[in-house]
Protein backbone atom coordinates (compact mmCIF):
# COMPACT_ATOMS: atom_id res chain seq x y z
CA UNK A 1 0.00 0.00 0.00
CA UNK A 2 2.79 2.41 0.86
CA UNK A 3 4.61 1.64 -2.36
CA UNK A 4 1.46 2.31 -4.33
CA UNK A 5 1.08 5.59 -2.52
CA UNK A 6 4.55 6.64 -3.55
CA UNK A 7 3.73 5.93 -7.16
CA UNK A 8 0.32 7.54 -7.36
CA UNK A 9 0.90 10.80 -5.48
CA UNK A 10 1.92 13.33 -8.12
CA UNK A 11 3.11 16.88 -7.69
CA UNK A 12 3.00 19.66 -10.21
CA UNK A 13 6.22 21.66 -10.38
CA UNK A 14 6.30 25.15 -11.81
CA UNK A 15 9.74 25.66 -13.29
CA UNK A 16 10.71 29.28 -13.54
CA UNK A 17 13.85 30.09 -15.48
CA UNK A 18 15.69 33.19 -16.53
CA UNK A 19 15.06 35.67 -13.70
CA UNK A 20 16.37 36.33 -10.23
CA UNK A 21 14.75 36.51 -6.85
CA UNK A 22 16.09 37.53 -3.45
CA UNK A 23 16.05 34.60 -1.05
CA UNK A 24 17.55 34.13 2.39
CA UNK A 25 20.61 32.82 0.59
CA UNK A 26 21.04 35.82 -1.71
CA UNK A 27 20.64 36.12 -5.49
CA UNK A 28 19.72 32.99 -7.40
CA UNK A 29 19.90 32.99 -11.19
CA UNK A 30 18.01 29.82 -12.15
CA UNK A 31 15.57 27.99 -9.96
CA UNK A 32 12.57 25.70 -9.99
CA UNK A 33 9.41 26.28 -7.97
CA UNK A 34 8.08 23.10 -6.34
CA UNK A 35 5.42 22.18 -3.83
CA UNK A 36 6.79 19.45 -1.52
CA UNK A 37 4.05 17.09 -0.43
CA UNK A 38 4.41 15.14 2.77
CA UNK A 39 3.86 11.40 2.40
CA UNK A 40 2.27 9.65 5.38
CA UNK A 41 4.33 6.69 6.50
CA UNK A 42 3.55 3.69 8.68
CA UNK A 43 6.12 1.75 10.68
CA UNK A 44 7.15 -1.76 9.72
CA UNK A 45 4.19 -4.09 9.68
CA UNK A 46 1.77 -1.28 8.89
CA UNK A 47 0.74 -0.78 12.53
CA UNK A 48 0.67 2.78 13.82
CA UNK A 49 2.22 2.88 17.29
CA UNK A 50 1.31 5.51 19.84
CA UNK A 51 4.22 7.95 20.07
CA UNK A 52 4.94 10.59 22.71
CA UNK A 53 3.45 13.91 21.70
CA UNK A 54 6.08 15.91 19.82
CA UNK A 55 6.02 18.89 17.52
CA UNK A 56 8.30 17.29 14.95
CA UNK A 57 8.31 13.68 13.80
CA UNK A 58 11.34 11.41 14.00
CA UNK A 59 11.02 10.43 10.34
CA UNK A 60 9.33 12.15 7.41
CA UNK A 61 9.06 11.75 3.65
CA UNK A 62 8.41 14.43 1.04
CA UNK A 63 7.87 14.16 -2.67
CA UNK A 64 8.66 16.93 -5.15
CA UNK A 65 10.22 17.36 -8.57
CA UNK A 66 13.84 17.96 -9.50
CA UNK A 67 14.41 18.90 -13.12
CA UNK A 68 10.87 17.80 -13.82
CA UNK A 69 11.38 14.30 -12.38
CA UNK A 70 9.66 13.22 -9.14
CA UNK A 71 11.90 12.34 -6.21
CA UNK A 72 11.15 11.20 -2.66
CA UNK A 73 13.20 12.75 0.14
CA UNK A 74 13.52 10.55 3.25
CA UNK A 75 14.34 12.47 6.44
CA UNK A 76 15.39 11.24 9.88
CA UNK A 77 15.76 13.58 12.81
CA UNK A 78 19.40 14.06 13.82
CA UNK A 79 18.96 12.72 17.35
CA UNK A 80 22.61 13.23 18.17
CA UNK A 81 22.70 16.92 17.23
CA UNK A 82 22.70 18.02 20.88
CA UNK A 83 24.52 16.50 23.81
CA UNK A 84 22.50 15.35 26.80
CA UNK A 85 23.76 18.26 28.90
CA UNK A 86 23.39 20.95 26.24
CA UNK A 87 23.20 24.49 27.60
CA UNK A 88 23.36 28.10 26.42
CA UNK A 89 24.91 31.18 27.99
CA UNK A 90 24.39 34.84 27.19
CA UNK A 91 24.88 38.02 29.20
CA UNK A 92 22.52 40.68 30.53
CA UNK A 93 23.06 44.39 29.69
CA UNK A 94 24.92 44.79 32.99
CA UNK A 95 27.17 41.81 32.25
CA UNK A 96 25.53 39.12 34.40
CA UNK A 97 25.92 35.57 33.09
CA UNK A 98 22.61 33.89 32.17
CA UNK A 99 22.81 30.14 31.55
CA UNK A 100 19.84 27.98 30.57
CA UNK A 101 19.30 24.38 29.51
CA UNK A 102 16.54 24.67 26.90
CA UNK A 103 14.61 21.58 25.80
CA UNK A 104 16.13 20.73 22.43
CA UNK A 105 15.30 17.07 21.90
CA UNK A 106 12.12 17.88 19.97
CA UNK A 107 14.02 19.82 17.33
CA UNK A 108 13.50 20.21 13.58
CA UNK A 109 16.90 19.35 12.06
CA UNK A 110 17.17 16.28 9.85
CA UNK A 111 19.54 14.18 7.80
CA UNK A 112 18.29 12.15 4.89
CA UNK A 113 18.62 10.77 1.40
CA UNK A 114 16.83 10.59 -1.93
CA UNK A 115 15.00 7.33 -2.55
CA UNK A 116 16.77 5.00 -5.03
CA UNK A 117 19.95 7.10 -5.04
CA UNK A 118 22.58 5.29 -2.97
CA UNK A 119 25.05 8.19 -3.18
CA UNK A 120 22.57 10.83 -2.05
CA UNK A 121 22.72 12.82 1.19
CA UNK A 122 20.59 15.55 2.73
CA UNK A 123 20.83 18.09 5.52
CA UNK A 124 17.49 19.79 6.08
CA UNK A 125 15.87 22.17 8.55
CA UNK A 126 12.12 21.53 8.72
CA UNK A 127 11.36 24.29 11.23
CA UNK A 128 9.53 26.51 8.75
CA UNK A 129 9.21 24.60 5.52
CA UNK A 130 12.18 22.70 4.10
CA UNK A 131 15.51 24.52 4.04
CA UNK A 132 18.94 23.05 3.38
CA UNK A 133 20.81 21.05 0.80
CA UNK A 134 20.68 17.60 -0.76
CA UNK A 135 22.87 15.67 -3.16
CA UNK A 136 21.13 13.87 -6.01
CA UNK A 137 22.74 12.10 -8.97
CA UNK A 138 26.07 13.75 -8.19
CA UNK A 139 24.67 17.30 -8.12
CA UNK A 140 24.22 19.48 -5.03
CA UNK A 141 20.88 21.29 -4.74
CA UNK A 142 19.59 23.82 -2.24
CA UNK A 143 15.97 24.10 -1.20
CA UNK A 144 14.21 26.79 0.79
CA UNK A 145 10.72 28.24 1.18
CA UNK A 146 9.73 30.87 -1.36
CA UNK A 147 8.61 33.88 0.65
CA UNK A 148 5.42 34.69 -1.19
CA UNK A 149 1.78 34.46 -0.24
CA UNK A 150 1.72 30.77 -1.21
CA UNK A 151 3.27 29.26 1.90
CA UNK A 152 3.69 25.82 0.27
CA UNK A 153 5.95 27.01 -2.54
CA UNK A 154 9.65 26.19 -2.33
CA UNK A 155 12.58 27.02 -4.53
CA UNK A 156 15.13 24.44 -5.67
CA UNK A 157 18.33 25.40 -7.43
CA UNK A 158 21.76 23.98 -8.10
CA UNK A 159 24.39 25.34 -5.77
CA UNK A 160 26.42 26.81 -8.63
CA UNK A 161 23.42 28.99 -9.54
CA UNK A 162 23.86 30.93 -6.33
CA UNK A 163 25.51 34.17 -7.36
CA UNK A 164 28.65 35.05 -5.47
CA UNK A 165 28.04 37.60 -2.73
CA UNK A 166 31.58 38.92 -3.20
CA UNK A 167 33.85 38.55 -6.21
CA UNK A 168 36.94 38.20 -4.02
CA UNK A 169 37.76 34.52 -3.34
CA UNK A 170 37.58 33.44 0.28
CA UNK A 171 40.43 31.46 1.78
CA UNK A 172 41.58 29.74 4.94
CA UNK A 173 44.54 31.39 6.65
CA UNK A 174 46.24 28.17 7.76
CA UNK A 175 49.74 27.72 6.36
CA UNK A 176 51.47 25.40 8.83
CA UNK A 177 51.24 21.64 8.38
CA UNK A 178 50.97 20.70 12.04
CA UNK A 179 50.83 22.20 15.51
CA UNK A 180 54.27 20.84 16.22
CA UNK A 181 56.88 19.26 14.00
CA UNK A 182 55.74 16.37 11.86
CA UNK A 183 56.90 13.04 13.18
CA UNK A 184 57.63 10.00 11.05
CA UNK A 185 55.18 7.28 11.95
CA UNK A 186 57.23 4.17 12.61
CA UNK A 187 54.63 1.57 13.37
CA UNK A 188 53.87 -1.83 11.92
CA UNK A 189 50.26 -2.13 10.78
CA UNK A 190 50.44 -5.60 9.30
CA UNK A 191 48.33 -7.04 12.11
CA UNK A 192 44.61 -6.47 11.83
CA UNK A 193 44.48 -6.51 15.63
CA UNK A 194 46.97 -3.66 16.05
CA UNK A 195 45.65 -1.30 18.79
CA UNK A 196 46.30 1.77 16.63
CA UNK A 197 44.28 0.25 13.80
CA UNK A 198 41.50 -0.49 16.28
CA UNK A 199 41.59 3.13 17.38
CA UNK A 200 41.28 4.38 13.80
CA UNK A 201 38.23 2.18 13.20
CA UNK A 202 36.37 3.34 16.30
CA UNK A 203 33.46 5.73 16.02
CA UNK A 204 34.49 9.18 17.25
CA UNK A 205 32.39 11.80 19.07
CA UNK A 206 33.24 15.51 19.20
CA UNK A 207 31.46 17.66 21.77
CA UNK A 208 31.41 21.08 20.12
CA UNK A 209 31.13 24.44 21.87
CA UNK A 210 30.24 27.46 19.72
CA UNK A 211 31.01 31.00 20.91
CA UNK A 212 29.37 33.98 19.17
CA UNK A 213 31.11 37.32 19.60
CA UNK A 214 29.43 40.69 20.05
CA UNK A 215 29.81 41.74 16.41
CA UNK A 216 27.82 38.71 15.23
CA UNK A 217 25.25 39.29 17.98
CA UNK A 218 24.74 42.81 16.62
CA UNK A 219 24.70 41.55 13.00
CA UNK A 220 21.63 39.43 13.78
CA UNK A 221 19.84 42.37 15.42
CA UNK A 222 20.55 41.02 18.91
CA UNK A 223 18.03 38.23 18.24
CA UNK A 224 19.10 35.17 20.25
CA UNK A 225 16.61 32.89 18.48
CA UNK A 226 17.95 33.79 15.02
CA UNK A 227 21.51 33.13 16.17
CA UNK A 228 20.56 29.78 17.69
CA UNK A 229 18.74 28.69 14.54
CA UNK A 230 21.72 29.58 12.37
CA UNK A 231 24.13 27.63 14.56
CA UNK A 232 21.81 24.61 14.72
CA UNK A 233 21.52 24.55 10.93
CA UNK A 234 25.29 24.87 10.48
CA UNK A 235 26.18 22.10 12.94
CA UNK A 236 23.51 19.80 11.51
CA UNK A 237 25.11 20.20 8.08
CA UNK A 238 28.65 19.74 9.40
CA UNK A 239 27.53 16.36 10.74
CA UNK A 240 26.82 15.19 7.18
CA UNK A 241 30.46 15.82 6.23
CA UNK A 242 31.90 14.01 9.22
CA UNK A 243 29.69 10.94 8.96
CA UNK A 244 31.99 10.12 6.03
CA UNK A 245 34.84 9.77 8.56
CA UNK A 246 32.78 7.93 11.21
CA UNK A 247 32.77 11.05 13.40
CA UNK A 248 29.68 12.42 15.11
CA UNK A 249 29.48 16.10 16.10
CA UNK A 250 27.30 16.90 19.13
CA UNK A 251 26.58 20.52 20.03
CA UNK A 252 27.15 20.78 23.78
CA UNK A 253 27.19 24.51 24.41
CA UNK A 254 26.55 27.93 22.89
CA UNK A 255 27.89 31.11 24.45
CA UNK A 256 26.82 34.47 23.05
CA UNK A 257 28.80 37.55 24.06
CA UNK A 258 25.71 39.73 24.14
CA UNK A 259 27.20 42.26 26.59
CA UNK A 260 30.77 42.63 25.38
CA UNK A 261 33.56 40.49 23.99
CA UNK A 262 35.64 38.39 26.38
CA UNK A 263 38.72 38.80 24.18
CA UNK A 264 39.89 41.36 21.65
CA UNK A 265 38.49 39.98 18.37
CA UNK A 266 40.57 41.67 15.69
CA UNK A 267 41.31 41.23 11.96
CA UNK A 268 44.73 39.63 12.62
CA UNK A 269 43.74 35.97 12.72
CA UNK A 270 46.88 34.68 14.42
CA UNK A 271 46.42 37.04 17.36
CA UNK A 272 42.68 36.38 17.63
CA UNK A 273 43.12 32.60 17.47
CA UNK A 274 45.82 32.73 20.15
CA UNK A 275 43.62 34.88 22.40
CA UNK A 276 40.60 32.64 21.90
CA UNK A 277 42.65 29.53 22.68
CA UNK A 278 43.94 31.07 25.89
CA UNK A 279 40.41 32.14 26.92
CA UNK A 280 39.11 28.67 26.16
CA UNK A 281 41.81 27.04 28.29
CA UNK A 282 41.57 29.40 31.26
CA UNK A 283 37.89 30.40 31.28
CA UNK A 284 35.61 28.17 29.23
CA UNK A 285 37.07 24.71 29.87
CA UNK A 286 37.07 25.01 33.69
CA UNK A 287 33.33 25.73 33.67
CA UNK A 288 32.14 23.71 30.64
CA UNK A 289 33.66 20.42 29.52
CA UNK A 290 33.90 20.00 25.74
CA UNK A 291 36.27 18.71 23.06
CA UNK A 292 36.49 21.58 20.58
CA UNK A 293 35.49 25.25 20.56
CA UNK A 294 34.79 27.56 17.62
CA UNK A 295 34.43 31.34 17.63
CA UNK A 296 32.00 32.84 15.08
CA UNK A 297 32.43 36.54 14.37
CA UNK A 298 31.35 39.29 12.00
CA UNK A 299 34.78 40.94 12.22
CA UNK A 300 36.32 41.11 8.74
CA UNK A 301 39.60 39.23 8.92
CA UNK A 302 42.64 40.58 7.09
CA UNK A 303 42.71 39.89 3.35
CA UNK A 304 40.53 37.11 1.92
CA UNK A 305 40.84 34.95 5.06
CA UNK A 306 37.55 33.77 6.62
CA UNK A 307 38.82 31.00 8.89
CA UNK A 308 41.84 29.95 10.91
CA UNK A 309 42.67 26.96 13.12
CA UNK A 310 45.49 24.98 14.64
CA UNK A 311 46.43 21.77 12.81
CA UNK A 312 46.37 18.42 14.62
CA UNK A 313 45.24 19.88 17.92
CA UNK A 314 42.05 18.15 19.06
CA UNK A 315 41.74 17.53 22.82
CA UNK A 316 44.51 20.06 23.57
CA UNK A 317 43.27 22.68 26.07
CA UNK A 318 44.53 25.77 24.28
CA UNK A 319 44.75 24.58 20.69
CA UNK A 320 41.53 22.62 20.05
CA UNK A 321 39.96 25.80 18.65
CA UNK A 322 39.10 27.61 15.41
CA UNK A 323 37.87 31.08 14.48
CA UNK A 324 35.43 31.63 11.61
CA UNK A 325 34.11 34.78 10.00
CA UNK A 326 30.35 34.75 9.32
CA UNK A 327 31.12 35.51 5.68
CA UNK A 328 27.99 34.33 3.88
CA UNK A 329 24.23 34.40 4.30
CA UNK A 330 24.02 30.78 3.18
CA UNK A 331 24.18 28.46 6.20
CA UNK A 332 25.37 25.55 4.05
CA UNK A 333 28.35 27.60 2.86
CA UNK A 334 29.16 28.52 6.46
CA UNK A 335 28.97 24.81 7.30
CA UNK A 336 31.59 24.13 4.62
CA UNK A 337 33.93 26.63 6.28
CA UNK A 338 33.23 25.21 9.76
CA UNK A 339 33.89 21.67 8.50
CA UNK A 340 37.12 22.87 6.87
CA UNK A 341 38.52 24.48 10.03
CA UNK A 342 37.53 21.48 12.15
CA UNK A 343 39.37 19.36 9.59
CA UNK A 344 42.55 21.24 10.45
CA UNK A 345 42.04 20.46 14.15
CA UNK A 346 41.69 16.81 13.07
CA UNK A 347 45.08 16.82 11.38
CA UNK A 348 44.15 17.65 7.79
CA UNK A 349 46.23 20.01 5.67
CA UNK A 350 45.12 21.94 2.61
CA UNK A 351 44.65 19.87 -0.51
CA UNK A 352 47.35 20.13 -3.14
CA UNK A 353 46.72 20.11 -6.88
CA UNK A 354 46.72 16.31 -6.96
CA UNK A 355 43.88 16.05 -4.44
CA UNK A 356 40.58 16.34 -6.29
CA UNK A 357 36.89 15.79 -5.67
CA UNK A 358 34.23 15.73 -8.36
CA UNK A 359 32.23 17.70 -9.30
CA UNK A 360 33.14 20.36 -6.69
CA UNK A 361 36.17 21.29 -4.62
CA UNK A 362 37.12 19.14 -1.64
CA UNK A 363 36.40 20.14 1.95
CA UNK A 364 40.07 20.97 2.58
CA UNK A 365 40.59 23.13 -0.50
CA UNK A 366 42.42 26.31 0.54
CA UNK A 367 40.10 28.46 -1.58
CA UNK A 368 36.44 28.29 -0.67
CA UNK A 369 34.11 27.60 -3.57
CA UNK A 370 30.73 29.27 -4.05
CA UNK A 371 29.42 25.69 -4.11
CA UNK A 372 29.11 23.74 -0.82
CA UNK A 373 31.66 20.97 -0.52
CA UNK A 374 30.61 17.33 -0.66
CA UNK A 375 33.55 15.17 0.38
CA UNK A 376 37.05 14.85 1.77
CA UNK A 377 39.86 14.05 -0.65
CA UNK A 378 41.98 10.93 -0.39
CA UNK A 379 44.81 13.23 0.77
CA UNK A 380 42.69 14.56 3.65
CA UNK A 381 41.76 11.04 4.70
CA UNK A 382 45.44 10.06 4.81
CA UNK A 383 46.31 13.21 6.81
CA UNK A 384 43.51 12.46 9.26
CA UNK A 385 44.45 8.82 9.63
CA UNK A 386 48.12 9.67 10.23
CA UNK A 387 47.12 12.24 12.85
CA UNK A 388 44.92 9.73 14.68
CA UNK A 389 47.69 7.12 14.70
CA UNK A 390 50.33 9.62 15.83
CA UNK A 391 48.36 11.42 18.56
CA UNK A 392 45.59 8.96 19.50
CA UNK A 393 43.40 11.82 20.84
CA UNK A 394 41.35 10.28 23.62
CA UNK A 395 38.62 12.86 24.25
CA UNK A 396 36.81 11.95 21.03
CA UNK A 397 36.32 8.34 22.11
CA UNK A 398 33.99 9.40 24.92
CA UNK A 399 30.61 8.44 23.56
CA UNK A 400 27.52 9.31 25.61
CA UNK A 401 26.68 6.92 28.44
CA UNK A 402 23.44 4.99 28.07
CA UNK A 403 21.91 6.92 30.94
CA UNK A 404 23.02 10.24 29.45
CA UNK A 405 20.82 9.98 26.37
CA UNK A 406 17.52 11.64 27.19
CA UNK A 407 15.81 11.09 23.84
CA UNK A 408 13.51 8.04 23.62
CA UNK A 409 15.43 4.85 22.91
CA UNK A 410 15.67 4.34 19.16
CA UNK A 411 17.17 1.32 17.45
CA UNK A 412 19.29 2.34 14.49
CA UNK A 413 20.75 5.69 15.63
CA UNK A 414 24.27 4.33 16.39
CA UNK A 415 23.80 5.00 20.13
CA UNK A 416 23.38 2.17 22.65
CA UNK A 417 20.65 3.30 25.02
CA UNK A 418 19.30 1.66 28.16
CA UNK A 419 17.78 -1.69 27.21
CA UNK A 420 19.88 -2.08 24.06
CA UNK A 421 22.88 -4.35 23.68
CA UNK A 422 24.31 -2.84 20.51
CA UNK A 423 23.40 -0.40 17.75
CA UNK A 424 25.05 -0.56 14.34
CA UNK A 425 22.76 1.91 12.58
CA UNK A 426 19.97 1.19 10.16
CA UNK A 427 19.70 -2.24 8.49
CA UNK A 428 20.93 -0.61 5.27
CA UNK A 429 24.01 0.91 6.94
CA UNK A 430 24.88 -1.80 9.47
CA UNK A 431 28.17 -3.58 8.79
CA UNK A 432 28.38 -5.52 12.04
CA UNK A 433 28.33 -9.31 12.12
CA UNK A 434 27.70 -9.26 15.88
CA UNK A 435 24.66 -6.98 16.11
CA UNK A 436 21.14 -7.50 14.74
CA UNK A 437 20.28 -4.10 13.26
CA UNK A 438 16.54 -4.78 13.41
CA UNK A 439 16.45 -5.45 17.17
CA UNK A 440 19.68 -3.87 18.48
CA UNK A 441 20.41 -7.18 20.21
CA UNK A 442 23.59 -9.22 19.97
CA UNK A 443 23.32 -12.16 17.63
CA UNK A 444 23.30 -15.69 19.06
CA UNK A 445 26.69 -16.54 20.51
CA UNK A 446 27.98 -12.97 20.43
CA UNK A 447 29.33 -11.42 23.63
CA UNK A 448 30.03 -7.96 22.27
CA UNK A 449 30.10 -5.80 19.16
CA UNK A 450 32.46 -2.87 18.53
CA UNK A 451 34.14 -2.22 21.87
CA UNK A 452 37.92 -2.05 22.27
CA UNK A 453 38.17 -5.49 23.89
CA UNK A 454 35.89 -7.22 21.40
CA UNK A 455 37.23 -9.37 18.59
CA UNK A 456 35.00 -11.38 16.26
CA UNK A 457 32.09 -10.89 18.66
CA UNK A 458 33.97 -12.36 21.66
CA UNK A 459 35.83 -10.79 24.60
CA UNK A 460 39.53 -10.50 23.93
CA UNK A 461 41.75 -12.55 26.21
CA UNK A 462 43.09 -10.95 29.37
CA UNK A 463 46.35 -9.10 28.86
CA UNK A 464 45.65 -8.05 25.27
CA UNK A 465 46.70 -4.45 24.68
CA UNK A 466 43.59 -2.39 23.94
CA UNK A 467 45.19 1.06 24.10
CA UNK A 468 48.89 1.28 23.37
CA UNK A 469 51.16 3.75 25.13
CA UNK A 470 51.61 6.53 22.58
CA UNK A 471 54.82 7.91 24.12
CA UNK A 472 57.01 7.92 27.23
CA UNK A 473 54.40 9.74 29.30
CA UNK A 474 51.51 7.41 28.51
CA UNK A 475 50.84 3.89 29.74
CA UNK A 476 49.23 0.99 27.93
CA UNK A 477 45.85 -0.42 28.94
CA UNK A 478 44.98 -4.11 28.76
CA UNK A 479 41.77 -6.09 28.33
CA UNK A 480 40.54 -7.95 31.41
CA UNK A 481 38.95 -10.86 29.55
CA UNK A 482 35.69 -10.23 31.43
CA UNK A 483 34.32 -7.21 29.58
CA UNK A 484 34.40 -5.66 26.12
CA UNK A 485 35.41 -2.22 27.39
CA UNK A 486 39.01 -1.06 27.62
CA UNK A 487 39.95 0.24 31.10
CA UNK A 488 40.04 4.00 31.65
CA UNK A 489 42.95 5.75 29.99
CA UNK A 490 45.88 6.31 32.34
CA UNK A 491 49.05 8.41 32.25
CA UNK A 492 52.61 7.97 33.41
CA UNK A 493 53.36 9.49 36.83
CA UNK A 494 54.42 13.13 36.85
CA UNK A 495 58.18 13.36 37.24
CA UNK A 496 59.10 10.18 35.34
CA UNK A 497 62.04 10.76 32.92
CA UNK A 498 61.11 11.00 29.23
CA UNK A 499 62.62 11.71 25.81
CA UNK A 500 65.93 10.04 26.71
CA UNK A 501 66.12 11.95 29.99
CA UNK A 502 65.72 15.33 28.27
CA UNK A 503 62.62 15.99 30.36
CA UNK A 504 60.15 14.73 32.94
CA UNK A 505 56.53 13.72 32.38
CA UNK A 506 53.90 16.30 33.29
CA UNK A 507 50.18 15.56 32.88
CA UNK A 508 50.83 13.07 30.09
CA UNK A 509 53.27 15.26 28.15
CA UNK A 510 57.06 15.54 28.01
CA UNK A 511 57.70 19.30 27.94
CA UNK A 512 61.24 20.02 26.77
CA UNK A 513 62.60 23.38 25.67
CA UNK A 514 63.77 22.19 22.24
CA UNK A 515 60.26 21.20 21.16
CA UNK A 516 58.88 24.46 22.54
CA UNK A 517 61.40 26.43 20.44
CA UNK A 518 60.44 24.45 17.34
CA UNK A 519 56.76 25.18 17.96
CA UNK A 520 57.52 28.92 18.25
CA UNK A 521 60.18 29.36 15.58
CA UNK A 522 60.12 26.41 13.20
CA UNK A 523 62.00 23.15 12.63
CA UNK A 524 65.49 24.72 12.55
CA UNK A 525 65.16 26.27 16.03
CA UNK A 526 66.91 25.11 19.17
CA UNK A 527 67.43 26.40 22.72
CA UNK A 528 69.71 29.42 23.19
CA UNK A 529 72.86 29.30 25.28
CA UNK A 530 72.48 29.64 29.05
CA UNK A 531 73.64 33.25 29.04
CA UNK A 532 70.45 34.40 27.29
CA UNK A 533 68.31 33.30 30.23
CA UNK A 534 70.01 35.82 32.54
CA UNK A 535 67.84 38.48 30.87
CA UNK A 536 64.89 37.02 32.83
CA UNK A 537 66.55 38.28 36.02
CA UNK A 538 65.90 41.90 34.96
CA UNK A 539 62.11 41.83 35.26
CA UNK A 540 61.86 44.44 32.51
CA UNK A 541 59.43 44.43 29.58
CA UNK A 542 58.64 40.84 28.59
CA UNK A 543 61.54 39.34 30.54
CA UNK A 544 60.43 37.99 33.91
CA UNK A 545 59.31 34.84 35.70
CA UNK A 546 55.74 35.78 36.59
CA UNK A 547 53.35 38.67 37.04
CA UNK A 548 51.64 39.50 40.34
CA UNK A 549 48.90 42.15 40.40
CA UNK A 550 50.11 43.46 37.05
CA UNK A 551 53.72 43.80 38.20
CA UNK A 552 56.62 41.88 36.63
CA UNK A 553 58.53 39.71 39.10
CA UNK A 554 62.06 39.02 37.92
CA UNK A 555 63.54 35.54 38.10
CA UNK A 556 66.04 34.62 40.74
CA UNK A 557 69.23 33.26 39.14
CA UNK A 558 68.31 29.66 39.97
CA UNK A 559 64.86 30.13 38.37
CA UNK A 560 65.81 31.95 35.17
CA UNK A 561 65.01 28.94 32.96
CA UNK A 562 61.39 29.07 34.13
CA UNK A 563 60.70 32.52 32.66
CA UNK A 564 60.83 33.66 29.04
CA UNK A 565 62.06 30.99 26.59
CA UNK A 566 65.06 31.94 24.45
CA UNK A 567 65.70 30.21 21.15
CA UNK A 568 68.16 30.43 18.27
CA UNK A 569 67.63 29.62 14.59
CA UNK A 570 70.32 28.16 12.38
CA UNK A 571 69.63 30.82 9.74
CA UNK A 572 69.87 33.76 12.15
CA UNK A 573 72.80 35.59 13.70
CA UNK A 574 70.69 36.64 16.69
CA UNK A 575 71.44 34.28 19.57
CA UNK A 576 68.71 35.27 22.05
CA UNK A 577 65.31 35.25 20.31
CA UNK A 578 62.06 35.26 22.26
CA UNK A 579 58.35 35.70 21.53
CA UNK A 580 55.59 37.38 23.54
CA UNK A 581 51.95 38.37 23.15
CA UNK A 582 50.08 41.38 24.48
CA UNK A 583 46.95 39.27 24.94
CA UNK A 584 48.46 36.01 26.24
CA UNK A 585 50.95 36.39 29.11
CA UNK A 586 51.99 32.72 28.88
CA UNK A 587 52.84 32.83 25.18
CA UNK A 588 56.59 32.38 24.74
CA UNK A 589 57.19 31.40 28.37
CA UNK A 590 58.87 28.14 29.37
CA UNK A 591 56.08 25.58 29.84
CA UNK A 592 55.15 24.37 33.31
CA UNK A 593 56.78 21.00 34.05
CA UNK A 594 59.83 21.71 31.85
CA UNK A 595 63.21 20.43 33.03
CA UNK A 596 65.28 23.35 34.34
CA UNK A 597 68.19 21.36 35.76
CA UNK A 598 69.14 17.83 36.73
CA UNK A 599 66.27 16.49 38.83
CA UNK A 600 64.50 19.87 38.75
CA UNK A 601 61.40 21.23 36.96
CA UNK A 602 59.48 24.51 36.63
CA UNK A 603 56.44 24.47 38.92
CA UNK A 604 53.19 26.43 38.60
CA UNK A 605 54.76 29.48 40.25
CA UNK A 606 57.75 29.33 37.87
CA UNK A 607 60.25 28.29 40.49
CA UNK A 608 62.84 25.69 39.50
CA UNK A 609 62.23 23.06 42.19
CA UNK A 610 63.37 19.56 43.06
CA UNK A 611 61.36 16.93 41.18
CA UNK A 612 60.70 15.13 44.46
CA UNK A 613 58.62 18.02 45.83
CA UNK A 614 57.18 19.36 42.57
CA UNK A 615 54.11 17.11 42.38
Curated annotation (Swiss-Prot):
Needed cofactors, names only, are: Zn(2+)
Write out the propeptide range(s). Answer: 21-195
**Where expressed (tissues)?**
Expressed by the venom gland.
| Record: active site | 341
- SMART domains (UniProt xref): ACR (SM00608), DISIN (SM00050)
Which InterPro entries has this protein been placed in?
A: ADAM_Cys-rich, Disintegrin_dom, Disintegrin_dom_sf, MetalloPept_cat_dom_sf, Peptidase_M12B, Peptidase_M12B_N, Reprolysin_adamalysin
- Binding-site positions, Zn(2+): 340, 344, 350
Query: What is the documented function of this protein?
Result: Snake venom zinc metalloprotease that may induce platelet aggregation.
Q: What is this protein called?
A: Zinc metalloproteinase-disintegrin-like
Amino acid sequence: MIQALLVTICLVGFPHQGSSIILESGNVKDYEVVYPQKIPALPKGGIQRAEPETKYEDTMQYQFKVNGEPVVLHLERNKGLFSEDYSETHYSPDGREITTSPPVQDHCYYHGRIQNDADSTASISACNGLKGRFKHQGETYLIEPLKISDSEAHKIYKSENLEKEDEAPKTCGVTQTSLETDETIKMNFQSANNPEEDYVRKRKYIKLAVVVDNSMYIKYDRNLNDIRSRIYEIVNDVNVFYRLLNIHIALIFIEIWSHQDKINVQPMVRVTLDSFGTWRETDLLPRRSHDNAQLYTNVDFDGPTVGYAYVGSLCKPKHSVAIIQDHTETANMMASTVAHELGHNLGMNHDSGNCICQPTLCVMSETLSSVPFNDFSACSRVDHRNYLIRDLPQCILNKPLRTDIVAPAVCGNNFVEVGGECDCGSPQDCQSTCCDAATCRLRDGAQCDTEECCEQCRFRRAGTVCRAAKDDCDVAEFCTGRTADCPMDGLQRNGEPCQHNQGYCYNGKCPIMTNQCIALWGPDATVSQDGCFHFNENGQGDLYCRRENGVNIQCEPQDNKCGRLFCVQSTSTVQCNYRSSATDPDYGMVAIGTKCGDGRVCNNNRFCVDIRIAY
